[in-house]
């Protein structure tokens, strides 16, 4: 236990800063159970704020029992614990493993504020399994990098303190100090790829090559170093290609080799937290989207969104529901939360650049996203035009034209966020501020 705690402390000391909250992903399995115990001791020695989160996937009839046990164990450790219930769309065609993982991290992200640490219990055996799964998929160096000890997550940092520790050492330590934990029956089901590797393949590899865990960790680390070097070497090129609106310049891409183009597109999508495309999809992005006829409106659908082209730039467009039927009333200096994670909208009276004159009955101000049939007379234009025409003049991509907030007074357009104020409502009372998500 002592050597494992010293290893745990060393990792946490690397990332922990005063006033940092530490959140532990707590499933109740042996890995996270020991992780909670290590955190309990570290907390007593360092007096930090801690919280545990159990994610209830609803996949096992025992999940309620596990949730109760986790809350009891967390209370015994003096650490608060939340239970997050998630719903999985099992008819989506995606694997249960992937759905559960994505839902789990979405739930955990809700508990992370800027600068916080999220601790997860992945260990050396998990690393071997992840490496082999990436190999099975035909992944390149990025996929074969497997899991890093730390990575940015939800404004904080995800840390894996047990990544260099084997499962057998974790189980032996937990038994020696008298810990109880839960056993998820699904972990025995070898129909799942990870379980197949865990129960049938990795034991054989370990018996034949006892140092396989260290070898995999070394290969994963070398792959990660190669990835970091490529990013470093192409950093200045990527900076020129990336535009202020987070689009990617096709002109900048065109002067480089196909290999560099593919890498730059991957760097771009990684920056936008999008799933990585396959080799085939990368070729299609360039051949069918970037190089499409100038009068075309090309797009390539991927899992989380689609790649579009506009004015010789590539755009990543996430899937969003239609918001044109949505309306919301807005009040002075009170942020209005927009639907579909489109940010907030505020009529700020304390702005240094006021450009809107408030109408006689500001309580009638409302926000819509539907430009259909609306006209406006921007202060920079000589006459009124349909919003459809104005969007074209202001170079707004077609897919964004129904995702831009329109401030209305009765049936009149007051302003279109980030574009213009109607001449009738031009003044110095307030400013319309649209804070978009990062």
From Swiss-Prot:
Q: What is its EC number?
A: 6.3.4.19
Organism per entry: Vibrio parahaemolyticus serotype O3:K6 (strain RIMD 2210633)
Query: Which family does the similarity line name?
Result: Belongs to the tRNA(Ile)-lysidine synthase family.
Coiled coil residues, start to end: none
Say what the protein does.
Answer: Ligates lysine onto the cytidine present at position 34 of the AUA codon-specific tRNA(Ile) that contains the anticodon CAU, in an ATP-dependent manner. Cytidine is converted to lysidine, thus changing the amino acid specificity of the tRNA from methionine to isoleucine.
Reactions performed catalytically: cytidine(34) in tRNA(Ile2) + L-lysine + ATP = lysidine(34) in tRNA(Ile2) + AMP + diphosphate + H(+)
Its gene name is tilS
Any single GO BP term? tRNA modification
**What keywords were assigned to this record?**
ATP-binding, Cytoplasm, Ligase, Nucleotide-binding, tRNA processing
Q: Where in the cell is it found?
A: Cytoplasm
Main localization category? cytoplasm
Q: What is known of its domains?
A: The N-terminal region contains the highly conserved SGGXDS motif, predicted to be a P-loop motif involved in ATP binding.
**Claim: Aminoacyl-tRNA synthetase is one of the keywords in the record:** no
Q: Which SMART domains match?
A: TilS_C
Q: Got a GO cellular component term for this one?
A: cytoplasm
Q: Its Gene Ontology molecular function terms?
A: ATP binding; tRNA(Ile)-lysidine synthase activity
Q: Give any Pfam family that matches.
A: TilS
Q: What is this protein called?
A: tRNA(Ile)-lysidine synthase
Q: Where does ATP bind?
A: 27-32
């Amino acid at each position: 236990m002592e050597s494992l705690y010293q290893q745990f402390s060393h990792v946490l000391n690397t990332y922990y800063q005063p006033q940092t909250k530490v959140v532990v992903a707590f499933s109740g399995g042996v890995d996270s159970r020991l992780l909670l115990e290590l955190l309990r001791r570290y907390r007593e020695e360092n007096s930090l704020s801690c919280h545990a989160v159990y994610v209830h996937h609803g996949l096992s009839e025992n999940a309620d029992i596990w949730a109760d046990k986790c809350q009891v164990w967390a209370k015994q450790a003096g650490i608060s614990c939340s239970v997050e219930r998630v719903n999985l769309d099992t008819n989506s065609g995606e694997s249960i493993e992937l759905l559960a993982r994505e839902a789990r991290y979405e739930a955990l992200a809700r508990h992370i504020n800027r600068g916080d640490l999220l601790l997860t219990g992945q260990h050396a055996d998990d690393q071997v399994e992840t490496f082999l799964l990436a190999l099975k998929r035909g992944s390149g160096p990025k996929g074969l990098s497997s899991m890093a000890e730390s990575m940015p997550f939800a404004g904080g940092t995800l840390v894996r303190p047990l990544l260099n520790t084997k499962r057998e050492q974790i189980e032996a330590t937990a038994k020696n100090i008298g810990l109880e934990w839960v056993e998820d029956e699904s972990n025995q089901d070898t129909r799942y790829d990870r379980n197949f590797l865990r129960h049938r393949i990795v034991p054989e590899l370990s018996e034949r090559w006892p140092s396989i865990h260290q070898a995999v960790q070394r290969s994963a680390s070398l792959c990660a170093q190669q990835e970091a070097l490529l990013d470093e070497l192409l950093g200045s090129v990527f900076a020129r290609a990336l535009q202020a609106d987070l689009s990617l310049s096709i002109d900048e891409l065109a002067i480089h080799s196909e290999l560099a183009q593919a890498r730059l597109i991957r760097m771009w999508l990684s920056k936008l937290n999008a799933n990585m495309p396959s080799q085939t999809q990368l070729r299609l992005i360039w051949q069918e989207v970037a190089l499409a006829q100038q009068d075309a409106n090309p797009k390539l659908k991927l899992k989380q969104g689609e790649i579009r082209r506009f004015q010789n730039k590539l755009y990543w467009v996430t899937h969003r529901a239609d918001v044109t039927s949505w309306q919301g009333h807005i009040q002075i200096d009170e942020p209005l939360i927009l639907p579909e994670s489109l940010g907030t909208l505020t009529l700020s009276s304390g702005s240094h650049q006021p450009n809107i004159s408030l109408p006689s009955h500001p309580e009638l101000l409302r926000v819509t996203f539907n430009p259909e049939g609306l006209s406006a007379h921007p202060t920079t234009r000589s006459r009124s035009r349909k919003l459809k025409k104005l969007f074209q003049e202001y170079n707004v991509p077609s897919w964004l034209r129904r995702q831009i907030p329109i401030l209305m007074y009765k049936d009149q357009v007051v302003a279109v966020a980030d574009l213009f104020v109607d001449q009738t409502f031009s003044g110095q009372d307030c400013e319309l501020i649209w804070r978009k998500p990062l």
